[in-house]
């Protein structure tokens, strides 16, 4: 059993999603958003760090996956996003978690089947894959998609290792 924490970073809203991966199946554990307040970026970064640290204490994940920075039209926005990512990554590293990073297109490809999917398509597929009663908020859905992408990647690596080393139905022997 592996618990995966997925993060969709942002300087104003950072989404998080937690899933459990067991025997090739995934189960929803929780999701939400860390909403920062205040004018100073340093205060917002501390709020992100503290929020991620609390989530790590609550869910005790084994793995941490985060979306990479995309090239924004506004360089200032890209810098702030990078700093928000850094704050989240430091929280994970301080908790001893391994960190995996995925491009947004890779996450969408893994969850929806196309790297050009829009937010609504991601929300819908996350709802379907995790058997949720309703679509999660967009930032939380993106974070759950990151966690699902990491889960799919891990399962693929296990299957590939099995072809070399021998596995029983996708699980390491």
UniProtKB/Swiss-Prot annotation:
NCBIfam families: PRK00039.2-1, ruvC. Its cofactor is Mg(2+). Its EC number is 3.1.21.10. This is Crossover junction endodeoxyribonuclease RuvC. SUPFAM superfamilies: Ribonuclease H-like. Mg(2+) 2 binds at residue 67. HAMAP family: RuvC (MF_00034). The keyword Hydrolase applies. Keywords: Cytoplasm, DNA damage, DNA recombination, DNA repair, DNA-binding, Endonuclease, Hydrolase, Magnesium, Metal-binding, Nuclease. It comes from Tolumonas auensis (strain DSM 9187 / NBRC 110442 / TA 4). The keyword rRNA-binding does not apply. The active site is at 8, 67, 139. Belongs to the RuvC family. Its main location: cytoplasm. Mg(2+) 1 binds at residues 8, 139. One of its GO terms (biological process) is DNA repair. It is found in: Cytoplasm. The RuvA-RuvB-RuvC complex processes Holliday junction (HJ) DNA during genetic recombination and DNA repair. Endonuclease that resolves HJ intermediates. Cleaves cruciform DNA by making single-stranded nicks across the HJ at symmetrical positions within the homologous arms, yielding a 5'-phosphate and a 3'-hydroxyl group; requires a central core of homology in the junction. The consensus cleavage sequence is 5'-(A/T)TT(C/G)-3'. Cleavage occurs on the 3'-side of the TT dinucleotide at the point of strand exchange. Homodimer which binds Holliday junction (HJ) DNA. The HJ becomes 2-fold symmetrical on binding to RuvC with unstacked arms; it has a different conformation from HJ DNA in complex with RuvA. In the full resolvosome a probable DNA-RuvA(4)-RuvB(12)-RuvC(2) complex forms which resolves the HJ. Pfam families: RuvC.
């Amino acid at each position: 059993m592996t618990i995966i924490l997925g993060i969709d970073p942002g300087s104003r809203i950072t989404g998080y999603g937690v899933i459990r991966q067991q025997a090739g199946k995934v189960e929803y554990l929780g999701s939400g958003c860390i909403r920062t307040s205040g004018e100073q970026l340093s205060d917002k970064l501390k709020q992100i760090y503290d929020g991620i640290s609390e989530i790590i204490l609550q869910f005790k994940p084994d793995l941490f996956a985060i979306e990479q920075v995309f090239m924004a039209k506004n360089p200032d926005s890209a810098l702030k996003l990078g700093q928000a990512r850094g704050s989240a990554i430091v929280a994970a590293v301080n908790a001893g978690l391994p960190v995996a990073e995925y491009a947004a297109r890779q996450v969408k490809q893994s969850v929806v089947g196309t790297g050009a999917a829009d937010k609504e398509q991601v929300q819908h597929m996350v709802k379907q894959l995790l058997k949720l009663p309703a679509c999660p908020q967009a930032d939380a859905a993106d974070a759950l998609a990151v966690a699902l992408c990491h889960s799919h990647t891990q399962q693929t690596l296990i299957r590939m290792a099995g072809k070399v080393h021998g596995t029983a139905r996708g699980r390491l022997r």
